[in-house]
Amino acid sequence: MPKTVLSDMKTHMEKTVAVLKAEFQKVRTGRASTAILDSVKMDYYGNPTPISQIATLAIPEPRMITITPWEAKQISVIEKAIFNANIGLTPSNDGKSIRLSLPPLTEERRREIVKDLKKMAEDNRVALRNIRRDAIDRLKKLEKDKSITEDELKKYEKEVQDNTKSFEIKIDEAMTNKEKEVMEV
């Protein structure tokens, strides 16, 4: 039973870190990344569809993304979806493809982005601590129900704490890497 508590906790913590890393990928840095468009959905025959599923996305230059739709008639719909997504980029349409030019980030904007990243990281650290608290509560309940001894409880609590620390380190590493990427000119 305690092993189930620990494996559930690990699974939740892994998901928390994975979600943070996915959120970090969406954050605009000085370089072009197709991840910026992951949240942009467009109406494709009545269904909200990610742009990546109906067009080829490419990065021909460090600060440019090109979108080439597989169906030419979808170009205006994609363009409208990008405008409506409010991602801070203005599409330019040449009839066959859409180009998104990423303006260089100012020092002030870079600092704002880093501040937002730190808030995201802290929110995820809080989520890890909540997962840790829930796991410890479940273990204490097992001890109260006499499923495990007090010594086993202490051992499992230490394991929970060690796992929490290792996942916090992963969050810190992801934060440091993303901060370097954002601050790089």
From Swiss-Prot:
Cellular component, GO annotation: cytosol
GO molecular function: ribosomal large subunit binding
One Pfam family linked to the record: RRF
SUPFAM superfamilies: Ribosome recycling factor, RRF
Signal peptide: none
Keywords assigned by UniProt, alphabetized: Cytoplasm, Protein biosynthesis
InterPro entries the record matches: Ribosome_recyc_fac (IPR002661), Ribosome_recyc_fac_dom (IPR023584), RRF_sf (IPR036191)
Keyword Magnesium appears in the UniProt entry: no
Main location: cytoplasm
Family: Belongs to the RRF family.
Function recorded in the entry: Responsible for the release of ribosomes from messenger RNA at the termination of protein biosynthesis. May increase the efficiency of translation by recycling ribosomes from one round of translation to another.
This protein's name: Ribosome-recycling factor
Organism: Pelobacter propionicus (strain DSM 2379 / NBRC 103807 / OttBd1)
Gene expressing this chain: frr
